[in-house]
Structure formats: C-alpha cells, structure tokens
Amino acid sequence: MDLTGRRAVVTGGASGLGAETVRALAAAGAEVTIATRHPQSAEPLVQEAAAAGAGRVHAEALDLSDVASVDSFARAWRGPLDILVANAGIMALPTRTLTPYGWEMQLATNYLGHFALATGLHAALRDAGSARIVVVSSGAHLGTPFDFEDPHFARRPYDPWAAYGNSKTADVLFTVGARRWAADGITANALNPGYILTRLQRHVDDETMRAFGVMDDQGNVKPLPYYKTPEQGAATSVLLAASPLLNGVTGRYFEDNQEARTVEDGDVQPGGVAAHALDPEAADRLWEYGADTLSAG
C-alpha cells in the first residue's frame, strides 16, 4: 500500500488496536492524527513513527463522551480527510454511568461520539473525493438488537454487556445508514477485530475474566489459543482503510479480513454479522435518533 499524501484520523490510537492501526497507516506513508483524551499518551508512538521515517504522526485531544470536545476537534480540522477510523471504545462499565447530557457512557463513547465526529467531519471527508470510514464494532452486537425504547437504561435494569452490545449494534447500523454519503465518495464499513487482550478490558472484574478463561486463580492474565495479538486484530481495520479491493464498498461488516456471513438471532455458530445490525430501516431510524440526540444535547 502507498498512502503517501493521504490523511487519516484514528480515535483511540495511542494503544492497543488503535496504535497498531496508526503504525500500519503511517508505515504506508499516510499522515495520521491520533485522536485521544490524553494526547501525551501518544507521544511514544509519535516519536517511534518519526524515528522510522514513516508518515507524520501527531496527536490531538478528543473526548468522545463530550460533545463540545468532538465539536472542537471537527471545527479545528483543516483540509480533506481520506480515512477516519472509529476505533476508540469502552466496554462493560460495571455500573450505569451517564455523561453530563444524560447519555449512557458506552453508547455515548462508542456510538454517539463517533457519529458526531463523522458528521462534523463530513465536509472534509467529501472533499477527499474518495474517503473511507472504518468502524470497529464487536461480536457483542450479535445478541443485542438496538433498543430504541430505552437506549440509556433509564427504565430497565442496567446490564454492562447489554449496554456494550447495544453500542456495538449501533456502530454497525451507522455504517449501513452512511450509504446516504455514497454520492459524496464516502464509504463506511464495520468490523469485528476478534478476541484480543487490550486496555478495553480494564473495567471487567476478575470474576468475569476467570469465567472467560483468561485469568487463573492467581490473577495472571493470559490469552486463550484463539485470541489475537493487537497487530493481528488491527489487520482488518487496515484492510478496510487502505485496500483498493474495497473501493466503492460500503455498509458491510468484516472479520478476519473478509466480509462476514449474515446470521439470524439464535444462530449458534460463532462469528458473522446479525441481520438486525444490517437492517436499513433500523439504520435510518438510528441515524435520525443520533441526529436528534446530538441536537438536543
């Protein structure tokens, strides 16, 4: 891949999957902006890219749970944007946590913040002429159709994993709804990076980690045989961001570097993308919900 002259934004690019995505894009010659809550945390990666003679890498402040922060980032952007990788996320907050706007924190960070960022950068993406949005979702969406009636768990018991799945279904539906931008030369696709141990698990308690089989009785964490390294997990993100094989492809869901099969609720086979996450009517409804929520906030 030669991405010389291309400009990319990677949210949550200071560590884990995001850092590996940044490394790959910069190595191909792209100018990469790491959008992160703590820009100083990205400094080692910035210096690493400079020492390697890769594309320019720099960091800017962005808090996806704060609409003002997202708006500030988008307003400050100058020039076209070729690649937007919506990589940042949080998972399984143990207690119901709300933003100052009253939004459930996982939905706010994983979906609403990225929706606000993409819409705020729409003109920059359009001006690139052939831009790509890459959304990192999760297999957690499979059993969780988006709950339009109570997305913030105001009237039902809070469940950390249901909230996470809710946000990840929203991520996939966003890419389906983004087909409205195809005439602007913008494509959007989602992906499941697979099982990987990163800082994403920082809110998961030891009991759950043991139940998942990734922590022993002494508290030692180790991946299971089917777990990927962060570099392996980032491969599909990089494919969607840069491969000419994906020119013009939009509204699809990928895993392991290929388009995933569609599964219906109740399918017990691992992997795939749920039909409820590809529903165009739900995608349009979610787009309207996102726009209304942001305008009210």
UniProtKB/Swiss-Prot annotation:
Pfam families: adh_short. Substrate binds at residue 138. NAD(+) binds at residues 9-33. The keyword Protein transport does not apply. Its EC number is 1.-.-.-. It is an enzyme of class 1 (oxidoreductase). It comes from the Bacteria. The active site is at residue 164. GO terms for molecular function: oxidoreductase activity. Transmembrane segments: none annotated. The keyword Oxidoreductase applies. Keywords: Oxidoreductase. PANTHER family: NAD(P)-BINDING ROSSMANN-FOLD SUPERFAMILY PROTEIN (PTHR24320:SF148), RETINOL DEHYDROGENASE (PTHR24320). Belongs to the short-chain dehydrogenases/reductases (SDR) family. This is Probable oxidoreductase. It comes from Streptomyces lividans. The lineage of its organism: Bacteria, Bacillati, Actinomycetota, Actinomycetes, Kitasatosporales.
